[in-house]
Amino acid sequence: MFKSFFPKPGTFFLSAFVWALIAVIFWQAGGGDWVARITGASGQIPISAARFWSLDFLIFYAYYIVCVGLFALFWFIYSPHRWQYWSILGTALIIFVTWFLVEVGVAVNAWYAPFYDLIQTALSSPHKVTIEQFYREVGVFLGIALIAVVISVLNNFFVSHYVFRWRTAMNEYYMANWQQLRHIEGAAQRVQEDTMRFASTLENMGVSFINAIMTLIAFLPVLVTLSAHVPELPIIGHIPYGLVIAAIVWSLMGTGLLAVVGIKLPGLEFKNQRVEAAYRKELVYGEDDATRATPPTVRELFSAVRKNYFRLYFHYMYFNIARILYLQVDNVFGLFLLFPSIVAGTITLGLMTQITNVFGQVRGAFQYLINSWTTLVELMSIYKRLRSFEHELDGDKIQEVTHTLS
C-alpha cells in the first residue's frame, strides 16, 4: 500500500514528521520574526486578498519551498523511487494548499468583526453608515472568496491525479506479484477496487487531519485572545480561557462517546466485505461451471450476507443516534457559551460573530475523529483487507516492477 508509492515508508514518514517539527518549531520560536526583521516585513497584514501577496506571506512561501526542497533532495539521493516526484513533492503541495485554505478562513474571520460592527452601527444609528462602506466590505470578502474558489478547484484537479498515481503504483505492485496473489478470495476486487478506494480515502483523511492541525495552529491563539471578552460561562461561572477549555472538553467528550459506541463497526465492515466476496466469487464460478452456484450453496452464502448486513444495520442505528444527537447539540453549543456575555452586553455583534466562528473552527478541529468516524471505519476495513492480502507477500522475494506508466 505504501511501499509502492513512497520510498522506505517507515523511515520516510518518521523523517518527514521530525523535519516538519523542526521547521515549525524554528519558525514559531522566533525564526519567522527574525527573517521578517531582516527583510523589513511590517507584520501588519491587511484584511483583504492583498494579505496573500504581502511580504510576510511571501517570506513564508520561500521558507516552505526551501524546507521542502532540502527534504526532497535528501530523499532523491538517499532512496530514489519511481514515484518520488508525486509522493514527495505532490504531498508537499497538497499540504501547502491545505495551509493556504486555512489562512483563507483566518482572513474571512478577520473580516467578520469590522463588517458586523458596521451592520450594528448602521442599525443603531441611522444614516451614520453609507452604502458605499457596505459595498467596499463586500468587495473585500469577494476578493478573498475568489482566491479560495480558484485554489480549491485547482487543488481538487491535482488531488484527483495524485490519487490515481497512487492507485497506479499499487496496481503495478500487486500485478507484478499476481501469481502469488491470484488464489486469494476476492483478489481481483482487492486490486481493482480497494486500491482506488484506499488511495482516495486515505488522501481525504490525511488532508482533513492536516487541515485540523493547521486550523488549531492558526485559530487557537485567536481563541485564547478572544476568551478575554468572555470571562464567564453558563453554569460554571468565571474561568480563565473558558472558551478554549470548553472547546477541548466538549470535543473530547464527543470523541470518547463515538469511540465507545462505534467500536464494533470496523470489524463488521471487514467481515461484510468477506462474505460479499465469497458470494460474488461463487456466482462468477457459476457463469462457467454448471456445477457451481447451486441453489443450496447460493442460499447459504446469501444467508451469511443478510445476517452480517442486519448486524451492521443494528450497530449503525445506535451509533447514528449518538452521533446525530451530539452534532445537533453541537450546533448551538458555541452560542450557548456566550449567553452571559450577551445578556451583560459586553460584546458587540461583530465580536460575537467572530468568537462563534473561531470557536467553531477550533471545536471542529478537535472533533476531527467525530467528523471522520464513518470514513475512518471504511478506511480501517479497506486497510484490513489489503493488509491480509499483502501477508501472502511477506517473507517472499518481491518481484520488481520494471515497466513504466505515468
Curated annotation (Swiss-Prot):
Residues annotated as transmembrane: 12-32, 57-77, 88-108, 138-158, 206-226, 243-263, 332-352
SUPFAM superfamilies, per the entry: ABC transporter transmembrane region
Membrane topology type: Multi-pass membrane protein
Subcellular locations according to the entry: Cell inner membrane
Membrane topology, Periplasmic segments: 1-11, 78-87, 159-205, 264-331
Example of a GO cellular component annotation carried by this entry: plasma membrane
Full protein name: Peptide antibiotic transporter SbmA
Organism: Escherichia coli (strain K12)
Lineage: Bacteria, Pseudomonadati, Pseudomonadota, Gammaproteobacteria, Enterobacterales
